[in-house]
């Protein structure tokens, strides 16, 4: 890494009064989680779906639950257990400790539904999950039932050869019909967003206090660029963004610094430079 880039990173850290952590699927790669780079990448983990040529957008939508709930819950049940068993990598703790050194602390904006930030000890009141959480459930037909969202305590058993749930399907605690993950899916008009709108309000309140945020973005893809757009919005042309991405680290001129590397390696580099100025 050249000295000019390192000097920029030190200057960003030294002037920051709050840490805005933004994270996409690439944040979990160093913990061993897949980032599903296209259908081919997903089919490596779910060969049963590959045999049927069922892509991510075809399984990750409410229609999949309506047409074949066992298969849809086979996919999401497997992911649920995988996330429960995953240990967050060191980078999570390093980011948390860095944020705690700044005047206004940290806030997390993530498109990940895996709950890894909570698992790593981050304050749940300082996390905005913009696409929801797999660790919560809602009714498939909330307009006819209830907008309630509740903890996902199911213990799924999956037949991986067919990507099918073989344990009982989760039921809505109000009407007894099928329950689904509290996640924003494709072509999804019934996702109950209100718990996450509350998270968003807390984030907006925090941003009003912070005058010079340091934005560290990790593993945010370009296919669904929600996280990337948000990072650039917060940076707001102030060169406050550090974008970490092994494949798509490109950053707009005047927006900040790009690090073409994996999440953990990039975080460790930033924290090393932080020790020199904090």
Where are these regions (language model features)?
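Conserved catalytic alpha/beta core of Sir2/sirtuin-type deacylases, generalized to analogous enzyme cores
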Residues: 1-278
């Amino acid at each position: 890494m050249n000295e000019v880039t390192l000097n920029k990173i030190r200057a960003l850290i030294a002037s920051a009064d709050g840490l805005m952590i933004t994270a996409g699927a690439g944040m979990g790669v160093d913990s061993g989680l897949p980032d599903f780079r296209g259908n081919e990448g997903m089919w490596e983990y779910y060969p049963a779906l590959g045999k049927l040529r069922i892509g991510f957008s075809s399984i990750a939508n409410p229609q999949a639950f309506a047409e074949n709930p066992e298969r849809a819950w086979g996919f999401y049940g497997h992911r649920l257990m995988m996330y429960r068993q995953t240990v967050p990598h060191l980078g999570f703790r390093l980011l948390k400790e860095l944020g705690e050194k700044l005047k206004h602390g940290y806030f997390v904006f993530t498109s990940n539904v895996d709950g890894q930030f909570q698992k790593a000890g981050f304050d749940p009141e300082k996390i905005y999950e913009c696409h929801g959480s797999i660790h919560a459930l809602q009714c498939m037909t909330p307009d006819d039932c209830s907008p309630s969202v509740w903890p996902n305590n199911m213990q799924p058993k999956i037949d991986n050869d067919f990507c099918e749930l073989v344990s009982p399907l989760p039921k809505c605690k109000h009407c007894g019909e099928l329950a689904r993950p509290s996640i924003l899916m494709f072509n999804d008009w019934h996702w109950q967003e209100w718990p996450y709108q509350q998270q968003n309000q807390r984030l907006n309140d925090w941003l009003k206090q912070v005058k010079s945020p340091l934005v560290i973005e990790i593993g945010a893809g370009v296919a669904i660029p929600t996280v990337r757009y948000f990072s650039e919005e917060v940076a707001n042309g102030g060169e406050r963004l550090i974008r970490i991405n092994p494949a798509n680290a490109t950053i707009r001129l005047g927006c900040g610094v790009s690090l073409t590397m994996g999440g953990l390696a990039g975080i460790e580099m930033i924290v090393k430079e932080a020790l020199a100025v904090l």
